[in-house]
Amino acid sequence: MRVFAKVGLIILLGLYLIILSKLILFKYLTIPDIINHFTFSYEGAIWNQHNFIPFKTIAYYLFLADINANIRIENLVGNIIGFAPFGFMVPLLSKRFLNLKNVIMATACLSLLFELTQLIFKFGSFDVDDLILNTLGGMLGYLPIKLIWIFIVQRQKYSSKDA
């Protein structure tokens, strides 16, 4: 049963990554557009649409943006929520990820992969703030697993003392 659950979780993680890729990279693109991006023949995004300054976009959405609050919330909270499942699933797949530092590194690397893909293939715009928010999302997704793990370890400690 344990192996079956792990295989199911790997499949679930794969589906999650496919959906996340669709939402981040291919949000508004048609199949021909996607092909053009990979052949570098796309004439779309330019460098000034990218953000390499930490907290610039976050500050803009929180304090300066003269846009609908729903759009601001979707952009800020959406990045956090989008990566929370990753932070939740990876510790279930490997004990190596029961350590917060490893979850942070894995989430940051996954987010960086998406951001660099957007930068190189012009699927959107690179934003260092997305990297920050996505990593925060992975950390928040990790918290329930860590709390459950602490509860289980404490419970095992007390039950072994009673025996």
Model-derived segments and spans:
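Bulky hydrophobic segments
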Residues: 1-123, 128, 142-163
